[in-house]
């Protein structure tokens, strides 16, 4: 089964996320387990954790279909030793929060070199940061998201993702989340069936489809290779419907969270229905 959902709000507590997901007809969802623009957060309460698990069960959401995202402040490849240490501690806390909620995945952007260190050195720091977090936790898989290549962000090329995966000591706890808008912005063509097929074959050859643990389904506002991360509604951007039709009929995309991060949250229910209508 295809598990389409959206990145839903946790207003009022994390336990409300599965309720939000159910209300839009989702079969998967993403969330922040804390405020994504702050370093510190109150600890999750026992009642909140129990209510989250109960609501997930009631909505039919299994842990492998839920894709929490870490804080936007975390740069696991920071060239500044103090900031790197802070990022590493925060990332471990994010993993621990996911574990407390009984979740199995944590989605994150790799990191940025900020024009202060070489790309390869930054990638080495990111890999080391991931290994430390996996050592400090037990069950959560680190799910690396490809980026649009904006500014000094790394992770926009499959070769960079492969560099990271290759250096993770526990291969059973590393995965990749492919964002369609980021792929397109990075120069990977998705506009036709042949184009997306070619892109996925390249991903399989360089990284490995076995590492695909989730996707973000977003159309793009900007042209191919723009390196600008601007999401558009499904079928309303420069990617078009062929890519989403291919994803909805591809066995590699079965039973992984397929998460909308499109701009209009009021349209998510409609977009979920639209995507399911593409199944053949």
Swiss-Prot record:
Q: Does the keyword Nuclease apply?
A: yes
> Where, by residue number, does Zn(2+) 1 bind?
69, 109, 145
EC number, UniProt record = 3.1.21.2
Q: Which cofactor does it need?
A: Zn(2+)
**Which segments of the protein form a coiled coil according to its record?**
none
Keywords assigned: DNA damage, DNA repair, Endonuclease, Hydrolase, Metal-binding, Nuclease, Zinc
For the ligand (Zn(2+) 3), the binding residues are 182, 229, 231
Note accompanying the cofactor annotation:
Binds 3 Zn(2+) ions.
For the biological process aspect of GO, one term held by this record is: base-excision repair
Q: Name the PROSITE patterns for this protein.
A: AP_NUCLEASE_F2_1, AP_NUCLEASE_F2_2, AP_NUCLEASE_F2_3, AP_NUCLEASE_F2_4
- Residues annotated as transmembrane: none
Which PANTHER family does the protein's record reference? APURINIC-APYRIMIDINIC ENDONUCLEASE, ENDONUCLEASE IV ENDODEOXYRIBONUCLEASE IV
Functional description taken from the UniProt entry: Endonuclease IV plays a role in DNA repair. It cleaves phosphodiester bonds at apurinic or apyrimidinic (AP) sites, generating a 3'-hydroxyl group and a 5'-terminal sugar phosphate.
UniProt protein name: Probable endonuclease 4
Q: Write down the species.
A: Pelodictyon phaeoclathratiforme (strain DSM 5477 / BU-1)
